[in-house]
Amino acid sequence: DWGCERVVMQYNLSRNNFGGFVEILGENEMCGYRYNISIADGKRTGQHHGNVFWISDFAGENRRVTSNNNFIYNNTVFIPSINDVNNNPMNHLEIFFREADYTYVYNNIVYVSDQAKLTMDIRNDSEQFNSFRNNMYYGNVVIDSNYPYNHDPSDLLSTDPQFSNTGGNSANDYKLKSGSPAFNSGFIINGSTDVKNYIQNNGGRDYFGNTVSSDTKPNIGAYNGN
């Protein structure tokens, strides 16, 4: 929704959510998503199709207000090949950002299956507006040529995270196999002991209850086990 402050979506299993996974609308402050697992979300097609991550400045009818200091970190997203609603390939999903100030996108895994596609449509791309670090993408990821995707070199494109059971329907399927490149490859989120400073305090535990340190590199994704 819009006009929210310090709303945190964490430790959720989101599965077959028609509209998609992350949605942050306008006039939001210190809101975000961390330590969630998204499986086959965003099957809605048409004018308001589903998205993987959606940041918007929509704040009501005929009202646009940018959001500030929001975050998306340590989530695991699995996109299947086929949309079982219409039996077409899952090729409509986007990471779609409109105007917002300071959105922090760290340590997420996005797995795009064989026939699916993910488009990066970052319309406010600059270091002031967004910080993309230590994210891992695998599969057909297309960058919209009209809006260049500026990101830290730590972002890993075309890297298989090696899930325990890719395509499964349970959270345990998205733990990491031994030898996964996602182990100890994340960005350290620290800088504050205030648990309500979600951008500089990582909350201390992952989706599965494993400890997340403030001084050693975490895993990429929602699983911080070993």
Regions found by a protein language model. Give the residues of each.
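Glycine- and acidic/polar-rich repeat regions and solenoidal domains
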Residues: D1-N172
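Surface beta-loop-beta hairpin patches that serve as ligand-binding interfaces in beta-rich domains
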Residues: A171-D173, S180-N226
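Short amphipathic alpha-helical segments
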Residues: S158, K177-S178
